[in-house]
Amino acid sequence: MFISISAGIVTFLLTLVGIPAFIQFYRKAQITGQQMHEDVKQHQAKAGTPTMGGLVFLIASVLVAFFFALFSNQLSNNVGMILFILVLYGLIGFLDDFLKVFRKINEGLNPKQKLALQLLGGVIFYLFYERGGDILSVFGYPVHLGFFYIFFALFWLVGFSNAVNLTDGVDGLASISVVISLSAYGVIAYVQGQMDILLVILAMIGGLLGFFIFNHKPAKVFMGDVGSLALGGMLAAISMALHQEWTLLIIGIVYVFETTSVMMQVSYFKLTGGKRIFRMTPVHHHFELGGLSGKGNPWSEWKVDFFFWGVGLLASLLTLAILYLM
């Protein structure tokens, strides 16, 4: 436990030092910053804010977790595969950000390219991680999927990777939401005695807390796709490594809600010839524009943050209660 906590502290400090250096480099190199949604007027002041800051906490957490695990004899298959997903999905996000920022390709990777790379990473993860007989845990009950587990694994990794990416649209929202989710999985890992996975979790929590100091409103830096895609993939990988896949539907309710809002909006728009359910999606923008109803007073980014963090915290506590108190 001491090793895991130490890893978190070291990653926190490295990120705390690394982010200002990253911002300074970004400014000196005169790199074009984040582009903003035109429909959310309060976001226009953020135009030009440095992005790709997730690169800092990602590198710090991966290196710290790897070396701490190596020197404490905890470099297990599970640790290796979680770090692999972090690195690969981080690289996919980096390429996406690179095309947007440096090549001025607004779309970045097109959806087919991004999906292909995410699926490739998922296949490699499936082939090497300890699956325990391709058993899917559904509310604590084992479901033997056999070879078909690979389709679930791909859906889980790609789905939650993109879901966290959608959540990263308000200052600090994604970073602390993931901290809350990881904290819940940290408890599960500790109870299961999987201290190797706990080490990786605490290393990332440390990095995200260090990043949040510069990412809360008004944000001095954004994590970019390099951070959000990696974090979503990490959450999916951890839920599978702990054989508690179903828990991510509740622990990750914020990401599920954000993704579902987009799917509902697009489907309803097509079916009705242009009508909308929400003022704007992902749904955090709906709250920004007009509160819960979409027709009331606009919510500040802090209010949106605390609402979603509260939902995420309650969902995480509910999951732990279901697992250990019922």
From Swiss-Prot:
Keyword hit for Kinase: no
Annotated metabolic or biological route of this protein? Cell wall biogenesis; peptidoglycan biosynthesis
Enzymatic reactions: UDP-N-acetyl-alpha-D-muramoyl-L-alanyl-gamma-D-glutamyl-L-lysyl-D-alanyl-D-alanine + di-trans,octa-cis-undecaprenyl phosphate = Mur2Ac(oyl-L-Ala-gamma-D-Glu-L-Lys-D-Ala-D-Ala)-di-trans,octa-cis-undecaprenyl diphosphate + UMP
- Please give a single GO biological process term from the UniProt record: cell wall organization
Tell me where in or outside the cell this protein is found: Cell membrane
Q: Does the keyword Membrane apply?
A: yes
Question: What are the recorded GO MF terms, alphabetically?
Answer: metal ion binding; phospho-N-acetylmuramoyl-pentapeptide-transferase activity
Cofactor annotation? Mg(2+)
Can you tell me where the transmembrane regions are? 3-23, 51-71, 79-99, 115-135, 138-158, 169-189, 195-215, 221-243, 306-326
Tell me the enzyme class: transferase
Among Pfam families, the record links this protein to: Glycos_transf_4 (PF00953), MraY_sig1 (PF10555)
- Which NCBIfam families does the entry mention? mraY (TIGR00445)
What's the protein here called? Phospho-N-acetylmuramoyl-pentapeptide-transferase
Query: What species was this sequence derived from?
Result: Streptococcus pneumoniae serotype 19F (strain G54)
